[in-house]
């Protein structure tokens, strides 16, 4: 498992933009809710720790992970958040259902990112066992929800700066690099 030697909840707040002015959409699967609610807690804790306001966080529930795609699409269209976080958990069983759902959700979220101006963050646990999911949703490996929240803040900031055209702030435009709170992000020409 890739996270065996990494705590997903660790981040350096000094490297993350302030989230106060961003609107966050969260679409969460009700399936495996004992896992997804843990991921949601990690998302909320990290967002608020980085300045997000509760009034700027919208939550929608969907029945399962496959429905995350439609939920995120509709949230983007109707709520106009700066970023959407999709939260789900698929645990491998005895049939091919696991592979089909994981592939479909992965491709669907990828498609939203390609076709929409709003970033969609992929917080879908795809584990072989329930214990692996527990370990990654607030257990021994930290919380993948925390990692997703930090990615969401960074992507909302990137979107904001890209929409400004990178030239609006002299502080941001430095030798073809965008500064994210002191971290360089190289711009490809």
UniProtKB/Swiss-Prot annotation:
According to UniProt, this protein's pathway is: Cofactor biosynthesis; riboflavin biosynthesis; riboflavin from 2-hydroxy-3-oxobutyl phosphate and 5-amino-6-(D-ribitylamino)uracil: step 1/2
Which reaction does this chain catalyze?
(2S)-2-hydroxy-3-oxobutyl phosphate + 5-amino-6-(D-ribitylamino)uracil = 6,7-dimethyl-8-(1-D-ribityl)lumazine + phosphate + 2 H2O + H(+)
Which NCBIfam families does this entry report, sorted A to Z? lumazine-synth (TIGR00114)
Q: Which organism is it from?
A: Flavobacterium psychrophilum (strain ATCC 49511 / DSM 21280 / CIP 103535 / JIP02/86)
Tell whether Metal-binding is among the UniProt keywords: no
Gene Ontology annotations for the cellular component aspect, listed alphabetically: cytosol; riboflavin synthase complex
SUPFAM superfamilies for the chain: Lumazine synthase
Residues at which 5-amino-6-(D-ribitylamino)uracil binds: 31, 65-67, 89-91, 122
Name the positions where (2S)-2-hydroxy-3-oxobutyl phosphate binds: 94-95, 136
Q: Where is the signal peptide?
A: none
User: What domain of life does the native source organism fall in?
Assistant: Bacteria
Q: What class of enzyme is it?
A: transferase
Role: Catalyzes the formation of 6,7-dimethyl-8-ribityllumazine by condensation of 5-amino-6-(D-ribitylamino)uracil with 3,4-dihydroxy-2-butanone 4-phosphate. This is the penultimate step in the biosynthesis of riboflavin.
Q: Which family does it belong to?
A: Belongs to the DMRL synthase family.
Q: EC number(s)?
A: 2.5.1.78
Q: What name goes with this protein?
A: 6,7-dimethyl-8-ribityllumazine synthase
A Pfam family the protein falls into: DMRL_synthase
């Amino acid at each position: 498992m890739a996270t065996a030697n990494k705590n997903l909840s660790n981040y350096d707040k000094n490297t993350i933009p302030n989230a106060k002015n961003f609107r966050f959409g969260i679409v969460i699967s009700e399936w495996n809710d004992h896992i997804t609610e843990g991921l949601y807690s990690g998302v909320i804790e990290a967002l608020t720790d980085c300045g997000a306001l509760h009034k700027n966080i919208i939550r929608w529930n969907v029945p399962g992970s496959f429905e995350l795609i439609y939920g995120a699409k509709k949230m983007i269209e109707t709520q106009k958040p700066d970023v959407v976080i999709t939260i789900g958990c698929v645990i491998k069983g005895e049939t091919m259902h696991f592979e089909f759902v994981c592939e479909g959700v992965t491709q669907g979220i990828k498609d939203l990112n390609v076709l929409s101006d709003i970033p969609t963050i992929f917080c879908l646990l795809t584990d072989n066992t329930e214990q692996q999911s527990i370990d990654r949703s607030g257990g021994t490996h930290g919380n993948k929800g925390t990692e997703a929240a930090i990615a969401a803040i960074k992507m909302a900031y990137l979107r904001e700066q890209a929409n400004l055209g990178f030239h609006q702030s002299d502080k941001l435009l430095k030798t073809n690099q965008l500064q994210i709170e002191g971290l360089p992000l190289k711009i490809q020409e």
